[in-house]
Swiss-Prot record:
Pfam families for the chain: DHquinase_II
Enzyme class at the top of the EC tree: lyase
Name of the molecule in the record: 3-dehydroquinate dehydratase
Biological function: Catalyzes a trans-dehydration via an enolate intermediate.
Organism this protein belongs to: Campylobacter jejuni subsp. doylei (strain ATCC BAA-1458 / RM4099 / 269.97)
Subunit details: Homododecamer.
Gene Ontology MF annotations: 3-dehydroquinate dehydratase activity
Pathway: Metabolic intermediate biosynthesis; chorismate biosynthesis; chorismate from D-erythrose 4-phosphate and phosphoenolpyruvate: step 3/7
Coiled-coil region(s): none
Stored CDD domains: DHQase_II
Catalytic activity: 3-dehydroquinate = 3-dehydroshikimate + H2O
Length: 159
């Protein structure tokens, strides 16, 4: 199983930017923790970070046929990007959205979420641990899809 982790604008500044909101853990440290959990679950991870909307859209599109699922922190683009929303919908892969802070306890503009309606699930407010929760969730969803496809194939074979 292969999962793409997509990090949006300013996520590369974790550990430096607004530590009181996002914590002291750097993006690279989050990725290392995810790699450890993935290796324990026989999952391969790829990581991508960009501050540019078009690059994120391109990366989502590249996921089609190459990965089993996506974990995305679209960061500020969560509230503004129809393009990222449409890319997620277009590839139709299991996708879990992550936000380190609880966006629903913050400024009103952060409570508008264009991404969530096209995602399998959303995890907010658990700090860096939210990435672990997202990883466990995407593994579960991908396993269910794999088992369903195997069952459907078996039924086709028995006809």
């Amino acid at each position: 199983m292969k999962i793409m982790i997509i990090q949006g604008p300013n996520v590369n500044m974790l550990g430096v930017r607004e530590v009181g909101i996002y914590g002291a853990m750097k993006m690279e440290e989050i990725h290392e923790q995810m790699k450890l959990a993935a290796s324990q679950n026989n999952v391969e991870l790829d990581f991508f970070q960009s501050n540019f909307e078009g690059e994120i859209v391109d990366k989502i599109q590249e996921c089609l046929g190459t990965v089993d699922g996506i974990i995305i922190n679209a960061a500020g683009y969560t509230h503004t990007s129809v393009a990222i929303r449409d890319a997620i919908a277009a590839v139709a892969l299991p996708t879990i959205e992550v936000h380190i802070s609880n966006v629903y306890r913050r400024e009103e503009f952060r409570q508008k979420n264009l991404i969530a309606p096209v995602c399998s699930g959303t995890i907010v407010g658990f700090g860096p641990f939210g990435y672990h929760l997202a990883l466990m969730g995407i593994i579960q969803i991908c396993e269910q899809i794999k088992n369903l496809r195997a069952m459907q194939q078996a039924q086709q074979t028995n006809k």
